[in-house]
């Protein structure tokens, strides 16, 4: 009499064979050397369902991306927690990677021109004149005086009547309330200090009245006024990395720092 095949026995044998093959494959992967030559310990039970990303020390110090690529952070169950698109040919260093991994929101990395785009959309409104007929001295005890009808310079003087007296008007910004935008006007005139480029002399620009509203594209006459103790700094709104500065035997200009002098003492009108 023919023996009826035991289907359950065949399934059992098949399962055993697959289990052996799976064990062999797992063993092969476990013993295979990583492409990045990095070993990882077992995932602790308390780390389940949490964000997983490579340690910064396990990544080359500076990675160069020559193509568009996304960085994705996933949980242990495969759920995408956040991702970020990296721009074409962007250089990504340790700090960038760490910031991306710790960022709680998805966002596109903005180009370096983003701050300038932000500034160009800002609007400034005059509040009031906050200083009248004040004198500006630099740390070399030089006083700002008129060089000619168009430019200013700094010199050591004995008679303060030679000094330029400034009125200072304060503005408020539509988007940034952390700074104090101001405009400098030569007292009893319609001449306003107007910035150009780095190492270029500031101009005395004539306007019929103090601008009530100034937009981001017309900010050459505005400076962010900062004080540190008795020192005063005027940072160009049009060029946020440049200060109004004095330079030995030269005109008042825009500069980043030494050898130009960027800090001033304001002598208030005592009248």
Curated annotation (Swiss-Prot):
One of its GO terms (cellular component) is extracellular space. GO terms for molecular function: copper ion binding; cytokine activity; interleukin-1 receptor binding. Belongs to the IL-1 family. Cytokine constitutively present intracellularly in nearly all resting non-hematopoietic cells that plays an important role in inflammation and bridges the innate and adaptive immune systems. After binding to its receptor IL1R1 together with its accessory protein IL1RAP, forms the high affinity interleukin-1 receptor complex. Signaling involves the recruitment of adapter molecules such as MYD88, IRAK1 or IRAK4. In turn, mediates the activation of NF-kappa-B and the three MAPK pathways p38, p42/p44 and JNK pathways. Monomer. Interacts with TMED10; the interaction mediates the translocation from the cytoplasm into the ERGIC (endoplasmic reticulum-Golgi intermediate compartment) and thereby secretion. Interacts with IL1R1. Interacts with S100A13; this interaction is the first step in the export of IL1A, followed by direct translocation of this complex across the plasma membrane. Acetylated within its nuclear localization sequence, which impacts subcellular localization. GO terms for biological process: cellular response to heat; cellular response to lipopolysaccharide; cytokine-mediated signaling pathway; fever generation; immune response; positive regulation of cell division; positive regulation of cytokine production; positive regulation of immature T cell proliferation in thymus. Residues 82-86 are annotated as: Nuclear localization signal (NLS). The modification Phosphoserine is found at residue 87. It is found in: Nucleus; Cytoplasm; Secreted. The modification N6-acetyllysine is found at residue 82. Residues 1-112 form a propeptide. Gene3D superfamilies: 2.80.10.50. Keywords: Acetylation, Cytokine, Cytoplasm, Glycoprotein, Inflammatory response, Mitogen, Nucleus, Phosphoprotein, Pyrogen, Secreted. PANTHER family: INTERLEUKIN-1 ALPHA (PTHR10078:SF33), INTERLEUKIN-1 FAMILY MEMBER (PTHR10078). This is Interleukin-1 alpha. It comes from Cercocebus atys (Sooty mangabey). Glycans are attached at residues 102, 141. The similarity among the IL-1 precursors suggests that the amino ends of these proteins serve some as yet undefined function. SUPFAM superfamilies: Cytokine (SSF50353).
